[in-house]
Amino acid sequence: MPEINTDHLDKQQVQLLAEMCILIDENDNKIGAETKKNCHLNENIEKGLLHRAFSVFLFNTENKLLLQQRSDAKITFPGCFTNTCCSHPLSNPGELEENDALGVRRAAQRRLKAELGIPLEEVPPEEINYLTRIHYKAQSDGIWGEHEIDYILFVRKNVTLNPDPNEIKSFCYVSKEELKELLKKAANGEIKITPWFQIIAETFLFKWWDNLNHLNQFVDHEKIHRM
C-alpha cells in the first residue's frame, strides 16, 4: 500500500484513518478488511479497492431533512454539505452482521452519536430503515477519494443534537424547496456538496421524500444501483 504523509492533516481525523473498513466485491460480498486510510486513497481505488458504507437521511416530524456541512478538518470532501450522516461499518462482529443489514444499522447509530451527538437510545437500529444500495466512485482531491457500496438508511424522528465540531461545521433542517435552492447554489459554485449526496438527490431523493409514509414500495435489498 502507498505511503502518504499525513503530518499536515487534522490529528483527530488522522487517528480515524486506522479504523478497519469492510472490503467487498462489486456484489457486496465481504472479501476482507483494510484501513480507512487505504480504502480512501485514489491509488488503491483505481486498482478496484471497494468498501461498504452507509448514508443516513433523517427527517423530523415536519418532514424536513437534516443536513450537515462537513468540517474543514475532514480529510475527504471538507466543508461540503451532505445528508445527515455518511460513514462506514467497521470490520468487527457487531457491524459485520449482514442479516437485515443489522451491522450497517448499528454502525449508523454509532456515527449519529459520534458526529451529531444524537443519544443512542433515540435512534435504535430497529428505527433505522434500510431502503437500497448504491455503488459509486468519486475523487475528493489528487490523493483521497471514495469507492463505496452505500446502504441508504432512512430515519423519521425528532432527535436531540449536540454536534462534534471536529466532524461538523454546521447543520440545518431543510424542506424540499430549500434543498432545491441549495442544489442550485451548488450548481452555481456558491457552495460545495458531496458527490454521493448529489447523485442521490438527483436520482432518488425527492421521489422517496414524497412518499415518506409509503417507503416500503422503494425497499429493494437485491439490486445495487450502479451510479
From Swiss-Prot:
It is found in: Peroxisome. One of its GO terms (molecular function) is metal ion binding. It catalyses: isopentenyl diphosphate = dimethylallyl diphosphate. The active site is at C86, E148. SUPFAM superfamilies: Nudix. Its cofactor is Mg(2+). Pfam families: NUDIX. It comes from the Eukaryota. GO terms for cellular component: peroxisome. Binds 1 Mg(2+) ion per subunit. GO terms for biological process: cholesterol biosynthetic process; dimethylallyl diphosphate biosynthetic process; isopentenyl diphosphate biosynthetic process. Mg(2+) binds at H40, H51, E146, E148. InterPro entries: IsopentenylPP_isomerase_typ1 (IPR011876), NUDIX_hydrolase-like_dom_sf (IPR015797), NUDIX_hydrolase_dom (IPR000086). Substrate binds at K36, R70, K74, S87. Keywords: Acetylation, Cholesterol biosynthesis, Cholesterol metabolism, Isomerase, Isoprene biosynthesis, Lipid biosynthesis, Lipid metabolism, Magnesium, Metal-binding, Peroxisome, Steroid biosynthesis, Steroid metabolism, Sterol biosynthesis, Sterol metabolism. Its EC number is 5.3.3.2. The modification N6-acetyllysine is found at K176. NCBIfam families: IPP_isom_1. Monomer. PANTHER family: ISOPENTENYL-DIPHOSPHATE DELTA-ISOMERASE (PTHR10885), ISOPENTENYL-DIPHOSPHATE DELTA-ISOMERASE 1 (PTHR10885:SF5). Belongs to the IPP isomerase type 1 family. Catalyzes the 1,3-allylic rearrangement of the homoallylic substrate isopentenyl (IPP) to its highly electrophilic allylic isomer, dimethylallyl diphosphate (DMAPP). This is Isopentenyl-diphosphate Delta-isomerase 1. It comes from Macaca fascicularis (Crab-eating macaque). The lineage of its organism: Eukaryota, Metazoa, Chordata, Craniata, Vertebrata. The gene is IDI1.
